[in-house]
């Protein structure tokens, strides 16, 4: 038995295919979803989406949004998403270093919050590349 997973951003469809299982980062922690999962709607945190296709795991960096699960269909609507294979490792590492430097230099509450968000996004992209597939 499989699940139909659809990952959408405002600009494009990132994924629309059947999967065996997913592990999704929500604001209250990670959840695993298998076929016949109870229906839920949840917020999606900045984090990794792990996708199992038969015996292979793929990863994707998600930049926050919402997910709806029900009737063996998962719809994930996020601000942005990147498949790990589409992320340039050098660019991701540079972005992480820039985000870390920006956080160190942040002055005031607003700059600190924005720098922390940029750092979380950058870390997520690096984690997606380094995740065990």
UniProtKB/Swiss-Prot annotation:
InterPro entries named among the record's database cross-references: ATP_synth_F1_dsu/esu (IPR001469), ATP_synth_F1_dsu/esu_N (IPR020546), ATP_synth_F1_esu_C (IPR020547), ATPsynth_dsu/esu_N (IPR036771)
Membrane topology: Peripheral membrane protein
Top-rank taxon: Eukaryota
Example of a GO cellular component annotation carried by this entry: proton-transporting ATP synthase complex
Cell compartments where the protein resides: Plastid, Chloroplast thylakoid membrane
Disulfide linkage: none
A molecular function GO annotation: ATP binding
Annotated SUPFAM superfamilies: Epsilon subunit of F1F0-ATP synthase N-terminal domain
Keywords linked to the UniProt accession: ATP synthesis, CF(1), Chloroplast, Hydrogen ion transport, Ion transport, Membrane, Plastid, Thylakoid, Transport
A family per Pfam: ATP-synt_DE
Keyword Transport: yes
Family: Belongs to the ATPase epsilon chain family.
HAMAP family: ATP_synth_epsil_bac
Family annotation (PANTHER family): ATP SYNTHASE DELTA/EPSILON CHAIN, ATP SYNTHASE EPSILON CHAIN, CHLOROPLASTIC
Subunit structure: F-type ATPases have 2 components, CF(1) - the catalytic core - and CF(0) - the membrane proton channel. CF(1) has five subunits: alpha(3), beta(3), gamma(1), delta(1), epsilon(1). CF(0) has three main subunits: a, b and c.
Function: Produces ATP from ADP in the presence of a proton gradient across the membrane.
Protein's name according to its UniProt entry: ATP synthase epsilon chain, chloroplastic
Classification lineage: Eukaryota, Viridiplantae, Streptophyta, Embryophyta, Tracheophyta
């Amino acid at each position: 038995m499989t699940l139909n997973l659809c990952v959408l951003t405002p600009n494009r469809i990132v994924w629309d295919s059947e999967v065996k299982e997913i592990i999704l980062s929500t604001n209250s922690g990670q959840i695993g979803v298998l076929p016949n999962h109870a229906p839920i709607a949840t917020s999606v945190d900045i984090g990794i989406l792990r996708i199992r296709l038969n015996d292979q795991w793929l990863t994707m960096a998600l930049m926050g949004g919402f997910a709806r699960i029900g009737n063996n269909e998962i719809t994930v609507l996020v601000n942005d998403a990147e498949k790990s294979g589409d992320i340039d490792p050098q660019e991701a590492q540079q972005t992480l270093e820039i985000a870390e430097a920006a956080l160190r230099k942040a002055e005031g509450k607003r700059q600190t919050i924005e720098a922390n968000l940029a750092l979380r996004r950058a870390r997520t992209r690096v984690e997606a590349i380094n995740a065990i597939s």
